[in-house]
């Protein structure tokens, strides 16, 4: 009942056929954010995402009390914490009547634009934390796009709303308002500068959650490695560079196997609503079906949602039936059982990184040590220090060609190497293509330079 108390739990507005909608915002999944309320031809409701996901009205105190009750119900049962999805969208510039300049031929503007006019988000988040998370000492990590450096203390500082937020800065690189079909591949230098930029901004304010992929993104190795360069060595390099950053390393299922994007040959193979929308956007812009498929094959999140390949059995050992999405055709080779048997696999490489993080001798440095970029201007070299009670140099040659890297101090110990050998030369290291290293180096020598 839109006129009853629960009608105030949502954003419902009067509207009649032929009238202008309350605003021109486009849903994150395409089309207007306004949908006709079932059973009420004179009302529309707001949904920033799918029409089956109506937005809750967080301005309503009664609604917030219901949310707190549900959160505490879980925490009282012993739940340790929450991953909080899309939380930045709960604050909106009411009364929701502002139109923004259209950014596509459909006359609409991405709902993302409204976030700039939404003031008071941290007030809501602090109330949520005070009423639920803080009394339970719960761990919280938030999906929070478009944060500003001056707001980080309020988000993840000592008294912040959350314990951590995901670093998604890399996922929006080269994004285009026109759509996926207009996006350009991410270069190694763009990736490096973006990652380093976030590390410098966060510094010691708190801990970011470092990711290269998740359920909302394509496979990281297909996105951040140059096309055609998804070798096991390159996958290990990319994973190692992310894992060793200051912050909390997150691995998504299949990342530990080095899974890549698949090649969808027909839009019917896709389940994701945003992918279907972007395919249509590409066609509407004049792309051929082949060009539209190329775009979704690069950026669709369905790549990360395929059945997990447990073995080389039919359907990857996931099921004896028919799964909801195709199985990655690489499953005869890229599967958990095979990688467990191969000591040089991506799976075993991640285990080595995890062991290093837990090693009592290096735990303080890897977990709590400072980040400092090294040779940042050297093209396609991504290198940085982790400085704590020890000094570690993390380095990756982000290209297929070998390149020389100067050493700032003598090597005390090679902790991780994704290749069987290391070539020292002229006071440095000749890094092979996509070679990745974690080196313990002389701390006093570095400090004196």
Task: List the predicted regions and their residue ranges.
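Active-site and adjacent substrate-binding regions of carbohydrate-active enzymes
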Residues: 1-412, 416-449
């Amino acid at each position: 009942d839109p006129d009853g108390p629960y009608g105030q739990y949502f954003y419902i507005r009067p509207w009649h056929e032929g009238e202008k909608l309350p605003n021109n915002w486009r849903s994150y999944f395409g089309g207007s954010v306004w949908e006709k309320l079932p059973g009420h031809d004179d009302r529309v409701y707001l949904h920033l995402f799918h029409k089956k996901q109506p937005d809750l009205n967080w301005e309503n105190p009664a609604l917030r009390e219901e949310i707190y009750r549900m959160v505490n119900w879980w925490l009282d049962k012993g739940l340790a914490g929450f991953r909080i999805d899309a939380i930045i969208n709960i604050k909106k510039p009411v009364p929701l009547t502002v139109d923004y300049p259209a950014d596509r031929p459909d006359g609409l503007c991405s709902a993302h634009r409204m976030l700039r006019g939404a003031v008071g988000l941290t007030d809501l988040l602090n109330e949520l934390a005070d009423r639920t998370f803080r009394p339970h000492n719960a761990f919280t990590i938030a999906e929070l796009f478009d944060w500003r450096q001056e707001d980080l203390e309020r988000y993840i500082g000592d008294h912040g709303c959350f314990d951590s937020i995901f670093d998604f800065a890399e996922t929006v690189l080269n994004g285009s308002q026109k759509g996926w079909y207009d996006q350009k591949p991410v270069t190694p230098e763009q990736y490096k500068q973006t990652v380093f930029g976030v590390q410098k901004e966060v510094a010691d304010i708190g801990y970011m959650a470092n990711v290269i992929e998740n359920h909302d993104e394509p496979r990281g190795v297909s996105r951040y490695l140059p096309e055609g360069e998804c070798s096991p060595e390159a996958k290990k390099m990319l994973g190692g560079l992310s894992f060793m950053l200051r912050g909390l390393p997150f691995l998504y299922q299949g990342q530990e196997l080095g899974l890549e994007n698949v090649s969808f040959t027909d839009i019917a193979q896709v389940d994701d609503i945003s992918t279907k929308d972007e395919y249509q956007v590409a066609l509407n812009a004049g792309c051929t079906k082949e060009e539209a498929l190329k775009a979704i094959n690069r950026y669709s999140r369905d790549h990360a949602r395929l059945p997990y390949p447990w073995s080389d059995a039919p359907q990857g050992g996931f099921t004896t039936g028919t799964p909801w999405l195709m199985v990655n055709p690489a499953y005869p080779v890229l599967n958990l059982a095979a990688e467990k048997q191969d000591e040089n696999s991506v799976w075993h490489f991640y285990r080595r990184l995890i062991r290093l993080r837990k090693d009592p001798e290096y735990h303080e440095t890897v977990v709590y040590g400072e980040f400092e970029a090294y040779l940042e201007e050297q093209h396609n070299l991504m290198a940085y220090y982790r400085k704590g009670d020890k000094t570690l140099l993390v380095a990756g040659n982000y290209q297929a060609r070998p390149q020389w890297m100067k050493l700032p101090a003598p090597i005390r110990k090679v902790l991780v190497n994704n290749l069987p050998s290391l070539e020292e030369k002229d006071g440095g290291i000749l890094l092979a293509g996509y070679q990745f290293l974690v080196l313990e180096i002389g701390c006093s020598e570095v400090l004196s330079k």
